[in-house]
From Swiss-Prot:
Lineage: Bacteria, Pseudomonadati, Thermodesulfobacteriota, Desulfuromonadia, Geobacterales
Organism: Trichlorobacter lovleyi (strain ATCC BAA-1151 / DSM 17278 / SZ)
Enzyme class: hydrolase
GO BP, one annotated term: base-excision repair
Protein's name in the database: Probable endonuclease 4
Domain of life (superkingdom): Bacteria
Protein encoded by which gene: nfo
Length: 281
């Protein structure tokens, strides 16, 4: 597919199967978990599996494949077991992506849990400085994802993401993944032309539009500023179709991957429905 619309696909049956699923759904881009998203230790990727994934992707016609880190990782956690496991797991993810030829990893900045956002952000900064130094084989980027700000989750504001990037010794290693559901739930109104223009101007001023390297395309079950992360099919939630229309027609984002994370339905059938709707805008 010539455009950059895509979806998150399962790796059930092997990493290369995600590529087959993306092509079958009519995707131009792809996002995957490289292992089970709810286990700290993943099955090591064999050389055979890595080669098969690389060759499948090269032959697929897909523009790009992006990894998403596992849900358990919390690099904002205070010192202790969760932080230690998170550092190890993200380091493993970086090493795996290097072997698979994936050069972008989307991640949630994490939760500060019991103290302050400022303390949590400092821990994220420290974690990435350590990870970049300890995993030189991964030469790609980490894409910090905008979040809805549930509970003590970090990344609700562009300013928090800016703090991580500016605080790191390696600011050039970061990009941003803009989740349409999360930003709306966080209070950024992209549902009107004026609101969309204002949000993108804020993003450009604080982070730089050149860092916006991926979209997660999700409608929201909850309202503007709700700080609740609940994805909905495109056009069936509180965002409506306009934010997606604005992005699809924005010349600045033509070659930026736009990844669906909406409910799948039977046999991933809803991916094709959502992709067709987006292409009709």
């Amino acid at each position: 597919m010539s455009d950059y619309l895509g979806a998150h696909m399962s790796i059930a049956g092997g990493l290369h199967k995600s590529v087959e699923r993306a092509v079958a759904a009519g995707c131009g881009t792809l996002q995957i978990f490289t292992r089970s998203s709810n286990q700290w230790k993943g099955k090591p990727v064999s050389d055979k599996d890595a080669d098969l994934f690389r060759s499948s992707f090269a032959a697929s016609g897909l523009h790009e494949v992006i990894s998403h880190d596992i849900y358990l990782i919390n690099l904002a956690a205070p010192a202790g077991d969760t932080r230690d496991k998170s550092l190890a797991a993200f380091g493993d993810e970086m090493a795996t992506c290097a072997r698979l030829g994936i050069n972008k990893i989307v991640m949630h900045p994490g939760s500060h849990t019991t103290d302050s956002p400022e303390a949590g952000l400092e821990r994220v900064i420290s974690a990435f400085d350590q990870l970049f130094e300890q995993t030189p084989e991964y030469e790609g980027l980490v894409l910090l994802e905008t979040t809805a700000g549930q509970g003590t989750n970090l990344g609700r504001t562009f300013e928090e993401l800016q703090t991580i990037i500016n605080g790191s010794k390696y600011p050039d290693r970061f990009g941003i993944c803009f989740d349409t559901c999360h930003t709306f739930a966080a209070g950024y109104n992209t549902a009107t032309p004026e609101g969309y223009a204002d949000v993108m101007a804020q993003f450009d001023r604080l982070l730089g539009l050149e860092r916006l390297l991926c979209f997660h395309f999700n409608d929201s079950k909850k309202g503007l500023g709700s700080r609740v992360d609940r994805h909905e099919h495109i056009g069936q939630g509180t965002l409506g179709l306009e934010p997606f229309r604005f992005i699809m027609h924005d010349p600045r984002f033509i070659t930026v991957p736009k990844i669906l994370e909406t409910p799948k339905g039977d046999d991933d059938a809803m991916d094709q429905v959502n992709l067709a709707l987006l292409r009709s805008l």
